[in-house]
């Protein structure tokens, strides 16, 4: 937490006045820093809260870059006065803190949300009840439709042809025809029955007086009959009475009348059938003959059923359309944000400090998971931050966790606002597009795409062999054909010596420009590389500094461009990382002249001093060219020149050697944020300073990182110098902590400085990665130019072929060290030589026997362990202390 809240401010106080008041303490605390205004830079945000009218609410917030300054401000200013107002200072809380009271606006918003949810539930319950009533109503209507056969027939007929198959249509037509025939028969029978009932009624009226004792079978015993009966019911009763009357009681005339009516109906049907078969009859006449009168009650029933069927279909369609909308629940903004982050794995950061670096956000977000990219948006014209950044995780789940934990949290004194970021645009070709290209083009594009993730950790100062020979030939005034003789067996050695000479010149030039070459050998991971520094390699000899500048300038402003006079390698530093990344991506493996450019990111903090005026590419200084030598020397002059360089470097080296043990000073109560560089800057001004080191330990939470242990050591040449430093620096303040100094009992330097241990090194070195084609003569000629050799041995196999390494022993250890320094990074027959110090030969026979015994025990133990692993079973193996040392 690096943000504080200040209460009880005067009404008239402004933001600038509040900043100035709290800056005084920072200037007093960081008084040892020489840069004026470093205190104000540590305050990142000042804000006094005001109401709608612009009146001060008498409290405000102040943000600090680090937590130590924020806690110090709370302790120093709490209970103090600004003019006549007593202020109260405490640590501010973030929005995610549960102790923060909920504002009234948020309470009203939540109450409204609960009211809407309750209203929605009531509406859903009402719709459910209404739907249930409609379903019951529809089920009753369906039952009525199933009972009415004529309505079913009508609905089947009115179905569209797309819903009825051909065989179903034939069956329906046949059933319709059968139904029509059946209906005609029923109509004819009903008509005959009505005539019969009419005749019987006449007969009954005529025979009331004549036959009073007429017996009617199965007569009803009801004493009363309904008065208001319908006409249809009378016909039904008449039909029932017709069945009850005995046929034997009818007269012959009546029976004949009935038979005549039946015959007439049959004739009418026969006439209709003949009319249908007559070809001369028109379709209209036939249709008129087939018409059947429908009662008004039946017509109304059919209309209602058809209208209901149409409404039912429309309601079903409407339900299908409305159902998906009701099924999808409304998601909150938080859920939508998490869903988008799960898809992209990218976060958008707002309200960040304008001076924040990418390393700050890497430290903040790396605990949540592995980061793929951190990008701070910069203005290409000014190089300043725009106030927002992007963080891309390899796993989207880690991005969600970071969003939940860090959103609206305090970072560098500001409230960090995190939003889901859009997916990063990629212009990469897919596999389908690559397949349509030539194979050579495919390999080129794939290599270019992998350039940003590829690192060259094997040789940072790699140089093109052709450019090396061209540089040496131009320096000696020779042609490359004259420098290297194809028929000479020592051509490979001459080429290696030429490369060593060029590498020596390049190192001298870079060291004069403030480049720390030791950083290049310490590169072990991508985290130790600086995106703004690019090493340019493999360009042909003759390339000028202006040509390289024209290549890199379109991508952004250059801070410096260093190119040695040899013209075989260059270092480019951009002002911002965005421009450097764009240049690295676009120019990797680009064809330039008759070669392909290799790019590599340089190490962090490789420059020990700021850029000079002549390092800027904007200064179009004249090209520095050396005059060629009029007399062409022989190729042996190269060895002589190399010897001169070796002697000069050895003399300079002798001046840096420290004779005798150094004296260490133990420093206690260091700030955990104090680094080796900070400690070095404070003590390097004293005479006799050697090295300063802060003791660290591995960070258990973050793999590959270290934590300060709160103490350190500073080494000086003599004890008198160390005592003088203790008297001057004991009790002073470094990074806000009062340090304590005293002499340490550790006398020998353990800083890893190779120069202080040069006397303990042997004159025997082992040369690894030696080409199998190299002979003992090649190794002898290569190392003979750096000193007097005592022995050269190239071990071989049983078939007389080389084993890939050699032993070279110099007469003096100093000569061996010079040879290792000069041949560092040199190639022999295309292989980079790797050199290390070898163990010296045993002084007496007993020591040699002990070494051989230890070696044999190690081999035996290794073989037994291998047999145990491959045997599949567990065996008991006794290993004593001496054997354990060999593992």
UniProtKB/Swiss-Prot annotation:
Gene responsible for this protein: MRD1
Domain RRM, first and last residues per copy: 2-94, 345-423, 532-604, 663-746, 763-840
Keywords for the protein's UniProt record, in alphabetical order: Nucleus, Phosphoprotein, Repeat, Ribonucleoprotein, RNA-binding, rRNA processing
PANTHER family linked: RNA-BINDING MOTIF PROTEIN 14B, RNA-BINDING PROTEIN 28
Pfam families referenced in this protein's UniProt entry, alphabetically: RRM_1 (PF00076)
Comp. bias intervals (Basic and acidic residues): 264-276, 316-325
Domain of life: Eukaryota
Family assignment from sequence similarity: Belongs to the RRM MRD1 family.
Additional comment: Present with 2220 molecules/cell in log phase SD medium.
UniProt GO BP: endonucleolytic cleavage in 5'-ETS of tricistronic rRNA transcript (SSU-rRNA, 5.8S rRNA, LSU-rRNA); endonucleolytic cleavage in ITS1 to separate SSU-rRNA from 5.8S rRNA and LSU-rRNA from tricistronic rRNA transcript (SSU-rRNA, 5.8S rRNA, LSU-rRNA); endonucleolytic cleavage to generate mature 5'-end of SSU-rRNA from (SSU-rRNA, 5.8S rRNA, LSU-rRNA); maturation of SSU-rRNA; nuclear mRNA surveillance; poly(A)+ mRNA export from nucleus; small-subunit processome assembly
Compartment annotation: Nucleus
Function (record text): Involved in pre-rRNA processing. Required for maintaining steady-state levels of 40S ribosomal subunit. Required for the initial processing of pre-rRNA at the A0 to A2 sites, leading to the processing of the 23S pre-rRNA intermediate to the 18S rRNA.
Location (main, coarse): nucleus
Compositionally biased tracts (Polar residues): 306-315
Organism of provenance: Saccharomyces cerevisiae (strain ATCC 204508 / S288c) (Baker's yeast)
Phosphoserine PTM sites in chain numbering: 220, 264
One Gene Ontology cellular component annotation held by this UniProt entry: ribonucleoprotein complex
Disordered, as annotated region: 121-143, 203-276, 297-336, 864-887
Descriptive protein name: Multiple RNA-binding domain-containing protein 1
Subunit text: Interacts with NOP1. Binds to the 35S pre-rRNA and the U3 snoRNA.
GO MF, any single term: mRNA binding
UniProt cross-references to Gene3D superfamilies, sorted A to Z: 3.30.70.330
